[in-house]
Amino acid sequence: MWCLERLRLGPECLRRSGDWLLPGRARGAKSRTTAACANVLTPDRIPEFCIPPRLMPRLALAALRNSWVEEAGMDEGAGRTDWDPRSQAALSLPHLPRVRTAYGFCALLESPHTRRKESLLLGGPPAPRPRAHTYGGGGGPDALLGTLRVPRAPGPATPAAPGCPRPPQDALARRPRGCRLLRVPDGLLSRALRAGRSRRLTRVRSVSSGNEDKERRAGSQSPARAPSTSPPSSRVPFPERLEAEGTVALGRAGDALRLAAEYCPGTGRLRLRLLRAESPAGGAPGPRAVSCRLSLVLRPPGTALRQCSTVVGRSRKASFDQDFCFDGLSEDEVRRLAVRVKARDEGRGRERGRLLGQGELSLGALLLL
């Protein structure tokens, strides 16, 4: 009857009751299955979940954390509440202050970006660097920046330079420890000031004629070569420059040009500057209606020696301020030379190249040589 009852229940019941019928055989089959599939997870065999250990030993990590807490001057318990440098990179920085919140974990006292913004906008400049690392000379923007710099940390009172503002003590106390990071914007500021000053000087030089730069270089090179040729005791003073102004009449209309002559005997350079145009009445004429080309020719009686020319465009200014330089002239040559000025029309059409006027002036009589 029992067998018939089992057959009536079906094959599932027989499979479940097979272990009861043959207990030794069932235990052997289970042990073989477990040994063959040891890595398979089953409901009756689930391993315990364990957290892998840290790569750094706990003692070394605790010692490092304690040293950081002591250096930052914060509560040691606040550092242990939520310490994980891998997940909280900001908390792993020792110079950032930390505090324990009401919820029991550690947090930053302030944002790490706050002090950076304050240092750019409100922080004072750092201590001055030694002069060996600077590019500028004595006075200038570098010296001004150096007088306004203050020490990085509040220390004993030092006498400030007269006329230099001193920052308040609370501003000095609020400054962060990483003040050396502020040297970068300070260096960029001083470099920008030096670049702006050099650009302004370049623009000033470009407005004036390039002949003045050549004369300045020639004048600076000649005294530099003087000590090598003669002893310092017998140094001869640099000869003075001869300067004079004169007027050159152009044609029969009575128009004239005002010239300024400057001659340096040491360098042998003669500079002629066109100052302005004059009317027959002696005053400044009206606006020039045409553009003209002015040619200056240095010629002894009979032959032409050197020639320079320039184009003067239309302008409402009566002054020309054009320079013509001639090099390698001795006093004897300058004494015998005369300057001839020609003005030609530089307009368009048939009038182009028409002679507007010409005149001549003796340099020896002008410079009193």
Curated annotation (Swiss-Prot):
Tissue expression as described in the entry: Specifically expressed in endothelial cells.
Superkingdom, taxonomy of origin: Eukaryota
Span of domain C2: 253-369
Record field: compositional bias (Pro residues): 153-168
Subcellular localization: Nucleus
Region ranges (Disordered): 151-176, 197-240
Keyword Mitochondrion listed: no
Any one of the GO CC terms: nucleoplasm
Primary localisation category: nucleus
Family indicated by similarity: Belongs to the C2CD4 family.
Protein name as it appears in the record: C2 calcium-dependent domain-containing protein 4A
Species of provenance: Homo sapiens
